[in-house]
Structure formats: structure tokens, C-alpha cells
Regions:
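N-terminal cap/lid segment of alpha/beta-hydrolase-fold proteins
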Residues: 1-24
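Glycine-rich nucleophile elbow surrounding the catalytic serine of serine-hydrolase chemistry
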Residues: 97-107
């Protein structure tokens, strides 16, 4: 059973995985993927959510190695899943993705085909629409026309190359959600999300169909500042029910 932090060689470099040990007897693991320019800590909230979810499964958190290109993040996510399976054979494996990490998780789940469940936290349905919405008109135009953008702010330095956008074009997220069925999907979103509009969660749920469980929290923001504990409790209960009912 996974208990301790571990490091392995991923496709783009070393990946360190922090483990919240499973407090149950379930042979189950939840892997968490962070959002755009985020981290496995998510301002401290991710550790709290992991502690809640560990009532039913070991929880693995990691940082993408710096790439913002979603195809490369998918490669790293597949590598983490493979490493978890090698370290805990036969486990029921769940995937939680936040924001852009949720989009990477949708792609990964559709390609993997053997996950026990998927949790989408503030996850977009249309990637280009999302970034056209949150970037300035000038930033989006420059990036879309082939210019590299450099950011240096409170989250550090980051270069966005034009293939950040063009890489999105090969992925139809609603179609991938449909391909992943009958995978159970829990969707968590805040109605006042200022980055990924709540209507995107509704479209994701519609794409999933009967296997979707959608919860939209009144007000709130993209970071779930008001609702992190409540959302964590809800997803922990969902994990417990999925494992108890034997659907995994």
C-alpha cells in the first residue's frame, strides 16, 4: 500500500509524488492533477482535500514538470498512473483534475480506459474559449498569431509558446467524456467561477450523461475559497460510495 513520498523518472524529468496514506482497508488510490501554473499544494487547499479523501483511498499529489502543453501533461499523468499501478497492483484508481488539470484528466481517462472514477474540479469544456475569456484580447491575439508570451508575476516566470493553443485543437473534450463512458464522473464547480464559467461544467455533465453527478456551489470562485472543505467532504463521500457499491 502507498504510504510514503516517492520519486520516479517521468517522460520529461523526475516526478515527486506526495502520498496521503489510506485510512481504510480499500485497495484504492486517488491521483490529483493541478491546474494551469498551479502546484500540488494549491495554496494549501489540496492537502486538506487529500486528507478528507484518504478516508477511503490513498491520495497521490504531484507537480507537472513545468510544461504548460496539455499533451505533455497527459504524458506525465499517464506515467504517474502507471507508477501507482506498479506500486499498488490491482488498485481501484481514481483521477481528480482541477481546472486545466481536469482537461488533462479527461483526455487521460478516455485513453486509459481502466479508471474507477473521474472527478472534475472547476474543469473547462472548451479550452480555447476558456483562455480567450481569461486572457486580454491582445495577449490571446499575439499568442494565436505565433508569438511567445512571457509572464513574470506572483506565480513565477512562465513562457507560453504558440503550441500551447494549437495543441488544444486535437482534443474534443465532450467527445472524450463520451468515449470514457460508462466511467462515473463527479463534477464540482462554483456558480461565480470567474475563470471557467459554470456553464462549462453543465456541458461536461451533459456529455457524460447518466454517469455524471454535478454539484454547483452557489457563489464561490475558481479556487473554491469558500467551499474547499465542503467540496472535499462531498468528493470523499462519493469515493466511499463508489467503493462500497462495488462499482469499481
Amino acid at each position: 500500500m502507498l504510504k510514503d513520498t516517492f520519486t520516479f523518472q517521468g517522460p520529461l524529468g523526475e516526478i515527486e509524488c506526495v502520498v496521503e496514506p489510506n485510512r481504510s482497508e480499500n485497495n484504492a488510490v486517488l491521483v490529483m492533477a493541478h491546474g494551469f501554473r498551479g502546484s500540488r499544494d494549491s495554496g494549501g487547499r489540496a492537502a486538506g482535500v487529500a486528507q478528507q479523501a484518504a478516508a477511503h483511498a490513498a491520495v497521490v499529489r504531484f507537480n507537472f514538470t513545468g510544461t504548460q502543453i496539455i499533451s505533455r501533461q497527459v504524458e506525465e499523468l499517464h506515467a504517474v498512473l502507471a507508477e501507482v499501478r506498479s506500486r499498488q497492483p490491482g488498485c481501484s484508481l481514481f483521477l481528480l483534475g482541477r481546472s486545466l488539470g481536469g482537461a488533462a484528466s479527461i483526455i487521460t481517462a478516455a485513453q486509459d480506459g481502466a479508471l474507477a472514477g473521474l472527478i472534475l474540479w472547476a474543469t473547462p469544456n472548451d479550452l480555447r474559449f476558456t483562455f480567450r475569456y481569461v486572457m486580454t484580447e491582445d495577449e490571446y491575439r499575439r499568442l494565436d498569431s505565433g508569438e511567445t508570451l512571457h509572464f513574470n508575476d506572483e506565480r513565477g516566470e512562465c513562457d507560453l509558446t504558440p503550441d500551447f493553443l494549437t495543441d488544444f485543437d486535437q482534443y474534443d473534450l465532450p467527445a472524450l467524456l463520451q468515449k470514457a463512458q460508462p466511467l462515473p464522473v463527479l463534477l464540482l464547480h462554483c456558480s461565480a467561477d470567474e475563470v471557467v464559467l459554470a456553464e462549462q461544467a453543465q456541458r461536461n455533465a451533459a456529455a457524460v450523461g447518466e454517469a455524471a453527478e454535478l454539484h454547483i456551489f452557489a457563489g464561490g470562485d475558481h479556487s473554491f475559497t469558500q467551499y474547499s472543505d465542503e467540496a472535499g467532504a462531498l468528493l470523499s463521500d462519493w469515493l466511499g460510495k463508489r467503493l462500497k457499491c462495488g462499482a469499481c
